[in-house]
Amino acid sequence: MFAKEVYIARRARLLSDMVAAGEKGIVLFLGNAEAPAQYKDNCYKWRQDSSWLYFFGLDEPLYGAVLDLESGEQTLFADDVEIGDIIWMGPQPTVLSRAESVGIRRAVPYGELDTVVAKALRAGRPVHFLPPSRYYNTLKLAALTGGAKPSEALVRAVIAQRLVKEDCEIAAIDAACDLGYEMHTVARDAIRTGIVEQEIVGKMEGLTLSKGWGVSFPTILTQHGETLHNHLHDKIIEPGKLMVIDAGAESNEHYASDFTRTYPTGGRYTPRQRDIYQIVCDCNNFAFSQIRPGVAYRDVHLATVRLMLERLKDLDLVRGDVDAMVAEGIGGLFMPHGLGHNMGLDVHDMEDLGENLVGYDPDQKRASQLGLGSLRMARKLVPGHVITDEPGIYFIPALMQKFKDEGLDKGFVHFAKLETYSDFGGIRLEDDVLVTADGARRLGRQRLPIEPDEVEAAMTRL
């Protein structure tokens, strides 16, 4: 948790922005409740709601809060533990002491939330709340508000605030990236033919647990990189394969890191693997060189796809005018995802609030084209944005066949050559990037080895 002044300032700005936008009424926040796996005493791993963490910092279940836009009054709703709870949990701080730790002076029992919201509704006052991501809060909000819809004004205000990271947030993300570096180093050093992929996943995730942290999302580790988010780890590691590892750590403050590297299972890339790997590596470096304030990340995506197609043309996998290929969406055959996404308290930051609202400026319209349509972050960049830079090239047999059968290639794809890559898999390379006043910097103290010679040197030292 940060100093209480951080949370006081965040809530003050939110209230100020909402009032400046002409909004009235109350702002209602709900923290998460525990989610039972089978029964109420055996729950899924606890994770607090990210917007709750941002404005209140309290990392325990069943909290609520109301901010009054007219009076400025702030109230925390939660229940103090009783003797039955103390027997199982031990002594706990009072709700009031927890409220005071984040700069709130008034704390009342959780049950009074119903009364406060009902009173506001009877008086005709708007009740602003965010879209819930958990079933308990969905049901609770429906009961409290009579099925009212989330407040778009509040959603936009929260997005505007959370998109630009404060110094304390950047420090937390840097720390998460440092542990992410260690995770990937442990994984790279553990790659051996003949072992099961899960052994490597266990070492990576065990490292985060040994630090008292956790992972920022389920680890992706696979020799089938053509499946973009393959969470199965049951394969024996074979020689001559490419292993995609997409993983990150979550800091004690719940900020994420998200790195991807692609390793040769035998320690050296084959000539064909190196050709494709170098293209992806160059695209990653090129994209980073384009990141700076005032540039739309959509334009960086398109420029990176153009470079990728130029290089694939050099390998005779595509033929024709590269600009026409970009316009026709041929890049989506090889990279059917966007260049990157926002990152912060969520690894895909704030997507529970609406992916288009988070990733697109009001004057930007999301494309329907394969690849570009999956771009999660298209906005014009400003200092304080934290984004990922993650180009990839994938040879997906089913997608290749679809392009061929339906003529989606528009005559640009050299299928006779492309089909020789059907067993290739995929390559993705991802760094986490902070937009600065005059450009960008990669987050974390050091960058994971990425150039093919660097990767091979690191693997052959073992």
Language model feature labels by segment:
Residues 1-462:
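Active-site neighborhoods and metal-handling regions in enzymes and metal-associated proteins
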